[in-house]
From Swiss-Prot:
<dbReference type="GO" id="GO:0006412">
    <property type="term" value="P:translation"/>
</dbReference>
<keyword id="KW-0699">rRNA-binding</keyword>
<dbReference type="InterPro" id="IPR020930">
    <property type="entry name" value="Ribosomal_uL5_bac-type"/>
</dbReference>
<comment type="function">
    <text>This is one of the proteins that binds to the 5S RNA in the ribosome where it forms part of the central protuberance.</text>
</comment>
<dbReference type="InterPro" id="IPR011035">
    <property type="entry name" value="Ribosomal_bL25/Gln-tRNA_synth"/>
</dbReference>
<dbReference type="InterPro" id="IPR020055">
    <property type="entry name" value="Ribosomal_bL25_short"/>
</dbReference>
<keyword id="KW-0687">Ribonucleoprotein</keyword>
<dbReference type="GO" id="GO:0003735">
    <property type="term" value="F:structural constituent of ribosome"/>
</dbReference>
<feature type="compositionally biased region" description="Acidic residues">
    <location>
        <begin position="197"/>
        <end position="208"/>
    </location>
</feature>
<comment type="subunit">
    <text>Part of the 50S ribosomal subunit; part of the 5S rRNA/L5/L18/L25 subcomplex. Contacts the 5S rRNA. Binds to the 5S rRNA independently of L5 and L18.</text>
</comment>
<keyword id="KW-0689">Ribosomal protein</keyword>
<dbReference type="InterPro" id="IPR001021">
    <property type="entry name" value="Ribosomal_bL25_long"/>
</dbReference>
<dbReference type="Pfam" id="PF01386">
    <property type="entry name" value="Ribosomal_L25p"/>
</dbReference>
<dbReference type="GO" id="GO:0008097">
    <property type="term" value="F:5S rRNA binding"/>
</dbReference>
<comment type="similarity">
    <text>Belongs to the bacterial ribosomal protein bL25 family. CTC subfamily.</text>
</comment>
<dbReference type="GO" id="GO:0022625">
    <property type="term" value="C:cytosolic large ribosomal subunit"/>
</dbReference>
<dbReference type="InterPro" id="IPR020057">
    <property type="entry name" value="Ribosomal_bL25_b-dom"/>
</dbReference>
Length: 224
């Protein structure tokens, strides 16, 4: 885990600032309602300045790093676990943060970064790299939390693929789907053959209506 890069400044919400109606009023004041839970403590309802949170959300690493949440001088270590956005405008409407407890493992969604694309034999042969998974759930101690996982595709030939078990993991990190009773080794990325553009047969077919009619049965016509 890298040093803590992001600090979220919030205020504790009072009882009359909680609930759907109160949340709407907070948003009108350019505040985003949020909650911090976990860590053997009671959940704490908070509010965060909309513009400040918006800037933080622009960074991919914000979603996979341990954060400092500053509540009126009291600091909490946490990770973001859920974010609700406006369905059409995209701005944050509510955020959930989970407290970090030293020595206690956490589940986190981590982005995958694909490297070596230009060096891949399949790309050089005209193939198409198709990424099927862009992030995965991992389990680890907070001290081992990676910002992202790297997937090297530099050796992929056309027709080949990489699975979850092919991802190199840092020490102390496991993939949740592979650490269960019935693991599922999903395909993460594959190299597809170049698509051959189908010939537009309709365009090549001659429209009978556009062809001048030929004299048919000319012999019969002559006999009439």
């Amino acid at each position: 885990m890298s040093d803590i890069l992001y600090t979220v400044n919030g205020i504790t919400r009072t009882n009359d600032q909680q609930g759907k109606g109160a949340s709407r009023r907070l948003r009108k004041q350019n505040l985003v309602p949020a909650i911090i839970y976990g860590g053997n403590e009671e959940p704490t309802a908070i509010a965060i300045k909309k513009n400040e949170l918006w800037k933080l959300l622009e960074n991919e690493a914000f979603f996979s790093n341990i954060l400092t949440i500053n509540l009126e001088g009291e600091e909490h270590l946490a990770v973001i676990k859920d974010l609700q956005r406006h369905p059409s405008k995209g701005f944050a409407m509510h955020a959930d943060f989970q407290r970090i407890v030293k020595g206690q493992k956490i589940n986190m969604q981590i982005p995958l970064h694909f490297t070596g694309r230009e060096e891949a034999p399949g790309i050089k042969a005209g193939g198409i790299l198709s990424t099927l998974v862009t992030d995965i759930e991992i389990v680890c101690l907070p001290s081992n939390l990676p910002e992202f996982l790297e997937v090297d595709v530099s050796n992929l030939e056309i027709g080949e693929s990489l699975h979850l078990t092919d991802i190199k993991l840092p020490e102390g990190v496991v993939i949740f789907e592979l650490d269960v009773d019935e693991p599922v080794d999903r395909t993460v990325v594959n190299m597809q053959a170049p698509t051959v553009e189908e010939v537009d047969t309709d365009a090549e077919e001659v429209d009978a209506a556009d062809v001048p009619a030929t004299e048919q049965g000319s012999e019969e016509d002559k006999g009439e």
